[in-house]
Amino acid sequence: MSRVGKMPIAIPAGVTVTVTPENVVTVKGPKGELVKAMHKDINIAVEDAQVVVTRPSDVKEHRALHGLTRALLNNMVVGVSQGFSKTLELNGVGYRAQLQGKKLVMNLGYSHPVEVEAVDGVDFKLDGTTKVIVEGIDKEKVGAVAANIRSWRKPEPYKGKGIKYSDEVIRRKEGKTGK
């Protein structure tokens, strides 16, 4: 049995989970609604305020899909009830971020400002001018947008300049030593 897959998912109050015969799962909650098509071989059942994921056999593919499906469902339930967020920090002289409507505009030392559009279901918040908070109900989208923003200026190892996640630790290098 998959260690992750065998754990049932508790459905919090205010969240409803429905599964169609084609394994399309709809999760509705206070923050919104998520719909995802799961693999047809995995069995998903909603039993008294919890979701149970089972697999038909011990074939390698089914074992892999068992834990994956359970993790995806759990992320959907957590997303519609609490939401997900990633915090990015801009480190560097003149590095700033500002919001223009739903668009994030950043000055990152290029000859032009960098603009990032908010994807559906993802919002930006600013904490000062050097902290960007990416929020949403879909963990995959939040992570992808945050990674896209970080890719504009990855942190460099000498001065730590660039865009980093707030919980990321940058391995620093020693500079050249003079004679």
Swiss-Prot record:
Any one annotated GO CC term: cytosolic large ribosomal subunit
Coiled coil region boundaries: none
Keywords: Ribonucleoprotein, Ribosomal protein, RNA-binding, rRNA-binding
Organism superkingdom: Bacteria
Biological process according to GO: cytoplasmic translation
InterPro entries cross-referenced by the UniProt entry: Ribosomal_uL6-like, Ribosomal_uL6-like_a/b-dom_sf, Ribosomal_uL6_a/b-dom, Ribosomal_uL6_bac-type, Ribosomal_uL6_CS
Keyword ATP-binding tagged: no
PROSITE patterns linked to this entry: RIBOSOMAL_L6_1
MF annotations from Gene Ontology: rRNA binding; structural constituent of ribosome
Record-linked Pfam families: Ribosomal_L6 (PF00347)
Function in brief: This protein binds to the 23S rRNA, and is important in its secondary structure. It is located near the subunit interface in the base of the L7/L12 stalk, and near the tRNA binding site of the peptidyltransferase center.
NCBIfam families per UniProt: L6_bact (TIGR03654)
Subunit structure: Part of the 50S ribosomal subunit.
Family recorded in the similarity comment: Belongs to the universal ribosomal protein uL6 family.
HAMAP family referenced in this protein's UniProt entry, alphabetically: Ribosomal_uL6_B
Protein name per its UniProtKB record: Large ribosomal subunit protein uL6
Annotated organism of origin: Clostridium perfringens (strain 13 / Type A)
Upper lineage: Bacteria, Bacillati, Bacillota, Clostridia, Eubacteriales
